């Protein structure tokens, strides 16, 4: 959200507003994750600690990269992507993050002529192959179901849970995103949340269908907060937005006001 601020400035703003952690999109640091220098990684750790925060982890993992794709039938591209996940895990570990949110809708969508089963097999192999390294690094990989307007692969939380169960590794879990759950239509967002055990959730994004933060649109967070409490989820609720006007600080302030109102 704070793409135009330095990382240290972002941490300072987040801390002053009452946030407890920050998520990092790798492309905001360098063109590729392996381009983030050791000095940058050290400065990230220092900026986070200086402001009394924690690094939650990484998201938007493949955003603004080229030649990478999770379900591609192209063997060369597939191998590059597998290797790149190892690079991302190293980055997440180095900045002391614990989760990697696998959204990247365009880089996972099935290509023309590819069946769902073929794409599924590719995804299972991709993520299963990364899980042991993630475990060693103390990182949990989180598959993020996304709406059909964004991708044609893994659109529902039920599909995300199915993938999680097939991979069957403690460091691979499902990610919940309010905007994406709203896109499912039915069941309701609270009922989708209730369909998931807290121990199967790796991370949780809060936002609105209008692409702003929680409380800035039509989604009612009262029933969502109740469902979150019912299943016993007591870890991160992380603000993710896609519109930045009037300005990121205002959005961050309004978002945390909503979270405090319903979740405190």
Language-model features: locations:
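Flexible, glycine- and charge-enriched loops at secondary-structure boundaries
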Residues: 34-41, 74-78, 113-120, 153, ...
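Glycine-rich, proline-tolerant flexible connector loops at the mouths of alpha/beta enzymes
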Residues: 25-48, 104, 111
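Active-site acidic/histidine proton-transfer and metal-coordination neighborhood
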Residues: 5-9, 47-51, 67-173, 183
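Residue-level detector of anion-binding/catalytic polar loops
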Residues: 20-21, 54, 98, 140, ...
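Conserved alpha-helical segments that form or flank metal/cofactor-binding pockets of metalloenzymes
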Residues: 47, 55-58
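Active-site-proximal loop/turn and secondary-structure-junction residues that shape catalytic pockets
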Residues: 1, 26-28, 61-64, 106-108, ...
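Histidine-acidic metal/acid-base catalytic patches
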Residues: 1-18, 42, 49, 96, ...
């Amino acid at each position: 959200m704070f793409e135009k601020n330095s990382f240290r400035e972002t941490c300072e703003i987040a801390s002053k507003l009452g946030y407890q952690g920050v998520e990092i999109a790798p492309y905001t640091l360098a063109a590729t994750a392996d381009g983030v220098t050791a000095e940058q990684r050290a400065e990230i750790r220092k900026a986070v600690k200086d402001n009394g925060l924690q690094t939650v982890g990484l998201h938007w993992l493949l955003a603004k990269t080229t030649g990478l794709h999770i379900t591609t039938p192209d063997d060369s591209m597939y191998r590059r992507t597998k290797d790149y996940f190892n690079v991302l895990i190293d980055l997440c570990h180095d900045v002391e993050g614990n989760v990697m949110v696998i959204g990247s809708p365009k880089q996972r969508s099935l290509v023309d002529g590819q069946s769902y089963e073929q794409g599924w097999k590719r995804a299972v192999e991709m993520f299963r192959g990364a899980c042991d390294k993630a475990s060693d690094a103390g990182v949990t990989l989180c598959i993020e179901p996304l709406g059909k307007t964004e991708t044609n692969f893994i659109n529902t939380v039920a599909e995300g849970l199915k993938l999680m169960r097939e991979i069957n590794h403690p460091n691979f879990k499902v990610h919940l995103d309010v905007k994406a759950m709203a896109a499912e239509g039915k069941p309701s967002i609270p009922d989708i949340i209730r369909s998931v055990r807290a121990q199967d959730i790796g991370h949780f994004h809060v936002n609105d269908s209008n692409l702003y933060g929680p409380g800035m649109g039509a989604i009612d967070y009262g029933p969502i907060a109740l469902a979150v409490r019912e299943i016993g989820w007591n870890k991160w609720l992380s603000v993710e937005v896609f519109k930045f006007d009037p300005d990121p600080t205002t959005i961050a302030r309004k978002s945390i006001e909503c979270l405090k109102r319903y979740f405190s």
